[in-house]
């Protein structure tokens, strides 16, 4: 179920403040965040966020196509190594 339209997109307050400060200063530094649940807004385009995936901060450069999605969608939390190979195939 999606979020109600009348509520608007969710963004943590501190993240919005950090993004505004970064825009004003004009420096290209990574904004570290643990807020995977925050929605990407149009004013975030061009900024780089360090989104925490449980182990480290993954750098996510925001583009126009990402607007409306959540930050956590671009920092996977699980690593897929593939299914185990058949033991008989390994021997040959």
UniProtKB/Swiss-Prot annotation:
Q: Mind telling me which PROSITE patterns this protein's record contains?
A: RIBOSOMAL_S19 (PS00323)
Record-annotated membrane-spanning stretches: none
Pfam family of this protein, just one? Ribosomal_S19
Gene Ontology molecular function terms on file: rRNA binding; structural constituent of ribosome
The molecule here is called Small ribosomal subunit protein uS19
- Kindly list the cysteine pairs connected by disulfide bridges: none
Q: What does the UniProt record say this protein does?
A: Protein S19 forms a complex with S13 that binds strongly to the 16S ribosomal RNA.
InterPro entries named among the record's database cross-references? Ribosomal_uS19, Ribosomal_uS19_bac-type, Ribosomal_uS19_CS, Ribosomal_uS19_SF
Does the record carry RNA-binding as a key word? yes
Q: What is the lineage of its organism?
A: Bacteria, Pseudomonadati, Pseudomonadota, Alphaproteobacteria, Hyphomicrobiales
């Amino acid at each position: 179920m999606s979020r109600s339209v009348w509520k608007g997109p969710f963004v943590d307050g501190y993240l919005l403040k950090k993004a505004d400060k970064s825009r004003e200063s004009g420096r290209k530094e990574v904004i570290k965040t643990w807020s995977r649940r925050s929605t990407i807004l149009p004013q975030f385009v061009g900024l780089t966020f360090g989104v925490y995936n449980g182990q480290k901060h993954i750098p996510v450069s925001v583009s126009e196509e990402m607007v409306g999605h959540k930050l956590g969608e671009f920092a996977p939390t699980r690593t897929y190594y593939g299914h185990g190979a058949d033991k008989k195939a390994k021997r040959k």
